[in-house]
């Protein structure tokens, strides 16, 4: 994201699809930016333009012929579920609809990567669920890589395959989502994953005579604890639970 804005790290390199962005000149970097779309917490739509014209805007800058840009913008608005709001202005749209316009605009130049910077932080839970469902669908349908930047762990659980936890500008922990949520190894990872009031030792296996159960793949609907008590002829106590 920093490289897209022409901010480069003080150390290290940034690569995209086999190309080192940190080694590119201005002209080549501008070309690579076309392969990166971005959506934000605030939608940054042009208030004097319709939804259709907002989606056309990046194509206008790239020199795409007007008729071709308009046709693609219509296709993208249909893709994000706003076929009936193309001529609406941002002030006439809900927060979720504005974010869908922003997503369509970010896809206008056919990027390889979509960067989502706190894209659902300003939305209510129901609207957030709809936007996340759309992003998952776009990932599957278009084969586009989606990079999500968020402090909402529920968002990570919902749509991500892998997660990197950053602390003080450094990657503290990285791995598959299920792996990180099941057994975070670092202090910052445990603080992010566990709910307030949860004993951290429960995540490390160091709490005496206690076990942490993780349900996956619909197994939460199975009577696991009840069956265990019947078979072992013993009782268990649930110290804490979360989703």
Model-flagged regions — what are they?
Residues 156-158:
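A short, surface-exposed alpha-helical micro-motif characterized by mixed small hydrophobic
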Residues 174-175, 183:
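ABC ATPase "signature
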Residues 207-243:
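Non-catalytic connector elements of ABC transporters
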Residues 1-139:
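ABC family nucleotide-binding domain
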Residues 41, 143-149, 151-152:
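Conserved H-loop
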Residues 181-212, 232:
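C-terminal boundary and immediately downstream tail of ABC-type ATPase nucleotide-binding domains
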